[in-house]
Amino acid sequence: MPLINLPEFSAELLSEFDARKAERIDTPVIQPAEPFLDIAGEDLRRRIFMTESETGASLCLRPEFTIPVCLRHIETATGTPKRYAYLGEVFRQRRDGANEFYQAGIEDLGDINIPSADARAIGDATGILARLLPGRRLSVTLGDQAVFEAVVQALGLPLGWQKRLIHAFGNMTQLEALLAGLVSPQFVTGLDDDIARLIAAGDEQALIAHIEQEMQATGYSTNASRSPPEIARRLKEKLVLSETRLDDAAFHVLEEFLSLHVPLVNASAALAGFADAAGLKLGNALSRFNGRVGALADAGVDLSCLDYRAAFGRPLDYYTGLVFEVTAEGSSAVLAGGGRFDRLLTFLGATDRIPAVGFSFWLDRIETERAAA
C-alpha cells in the first residue's frame, strides 16, 4: 500500500539509506502483541493500540520498527551481516502530537565488529541529519548500559537487586526509588507464619508442597496463575531483597557513577578514574567503551558534539549496551535515537546469537526543525 502524506524530504532520506547500502524492508502494520508486551519496556507498552484476531490472538498496531524488522529477518532466514532500512507509520498513544506518525531508520544485524558497528550507527544518524538540517549543529547524548551493569555487578549486590537496578536503567525516578529501598530496606510483612518458617528453614520442597496445598484448598489453578515452585522462588527472592542493605560507601559509589556527565573525549579517563577511586574492576565493559570511542574517531565522527552521561538510557527494555539520542543544539526534541540490542533476535527466536545495533528518526520532529530554519 503506498504511503501518503510523507514528509517532503522522504526521497532524500531514502537516497541516504541507499548510499549506505541498507536494504529497504516493509513490515505489516498489524503485529503480534506478545513481543512488544514482553520486551519493549513499560513506557512503550502503555502506549500500544491493542486488538485481537478472530481466534483470540493478541495483536497490536505497529508501535515501532525494530522488533518487526528482526522478526522479518528471522522469518526469511536471511544471512548476516545485513543492513535494513525502513520508512513507515507507527502508532502510539501520545499526549502531544498525532497518534500515528512516520519513523524511518536503519537496523544493522550481524556485524561482529561491535565498536565499528556502533560508530557507524552514530555516524549514519548524525550524517543523515546533517544533510536534512544543513547548518544546524547537532548534539548527541550517549550512554552505555553495559558499563552500568558492570558497576552494579562489581558492587556485589544480590542477583535480584542487580536485575531490578539494570531494568530501571535510564529511568532516574525508578532508579532513585530502588536505591532508597536499598539504603532503608522495607521488610516483608504479612507472610503466613508457616510460609515464613519454611523460608527461614530453607526447606524449599516443604515450602512448595505447602503452597500447592494452599492453592488446592483455595481453588487456585496452576494453569491460570504461577506454579508453586515459581511462587516459592519469588517469595524467597522477595525476602532476600528486603533484607539486603546497601552500605553508605556503596551507595555513594553508585551516586557518583550516575552523576558522571562529561564530553565523550573525556569519558574514558573519567570512567577509569571513577573505577580506580572506587576500587572497582570494570574490565571488558571499559575496554569495549574505549574501543567504541576510538572507532568513532576513526570513522570521522565529530566527537565535539558527543556527551557521555552515565545515567542515560532509553525507555526500551531490549537495549544491552550503547544507547544514544540526537537533538538539534538548544532543543530538547529528540530527532533520532538508537542503541545496541544483542539479545533481541535470540529472544524473538533466532537460533544463533546475532549482534545488532540500529537507530530511528522522528520524521515529524525533523519536519518541524526544517520549517523553523
From Swiss-Prot:
Keywords: Amino-acid biosynthesis, Cytoplasm, Histidine biosynthesis
Gene3D superfamilies: Bira Bifunctional Protein, Domain 2
GO MF annotation, one: histidine-tRNA ligase activity
Primary location group: cytoplasm
Subcellular location: Cytoplasm
Pathway field: Amino-acid biosynthesis; L-histidine biosynthesis; L-histidine from 5-phospho-alpha-D-ribose 1-diphosphate: step 1/9
One Pfam family hit: tRNA-synt_His
Cellular component per GO, a single term: cytoplasm
Family: Belongs to the class-II aminoacyl-tRNA synthetase family. HisZ subfamily.
Additional notes on this entry: This function is generally fulfilled by the C-terminal part of HisG, which is missing in some bacteria such as this one.
Record protein name field: ATP phosphoribosyltransferase regulatory subunit
Gene field: hisZ
